[in-house]
Amino acid sequence: FFNLTEDNIYKSAVIKDIDSNIGQLLKTDAKFYAIHVSPSEKELRAMGNTEQEQAEAMKHYIREVFVPEYAKNFNKGLSEADIKFYGKIHFDRNGSDNELNMHCHLIVSRKDQTNKKKLSPLTNHKNTQKGTVTSGFDRVNLFQQAEQGFDKLFDYHRQQSESFDYHNTIKNGSIF
């Protein structure tokens, strides 16, 4: 596993760290969220020519783009350093005929690094200012920002038909 600053972290250390970062969570609360980062074959080619190059590029993307954007989308003034996460890169996908299949599984703690703030990317609140829940999480914005960050980091020239906005519009209708 890897996190923001380290590589080659043992599975037992990951389990212990996530399991101990649960202060004030209810028994019904999730201890962590599993996030899957799965580039297309074209995106993988932009990340490097070998599996090793692609894996290093994926770690760089997770650390420099995805986790910082994830943190920002809580609208709580968080940075990537506040997010407790571990990533594991895989090169195979069951049921896939693609030549390139690298993807990354992220385990993200429900609590921040200090074990004080509850974080949920599944909340439906978006940047609310009043009521019980202030802040929220904007999943659409996360996908847009992560995609733009990918394109900039790897100098990737995305076709409109490959974009999140395009697929989201096809799936859900109107762009407004």
Could you tell me what each predicted segment is?
Residues 1-176:
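N-terminal nicking endonuclease/strand-transfer module with a His-rich metal-binding environment
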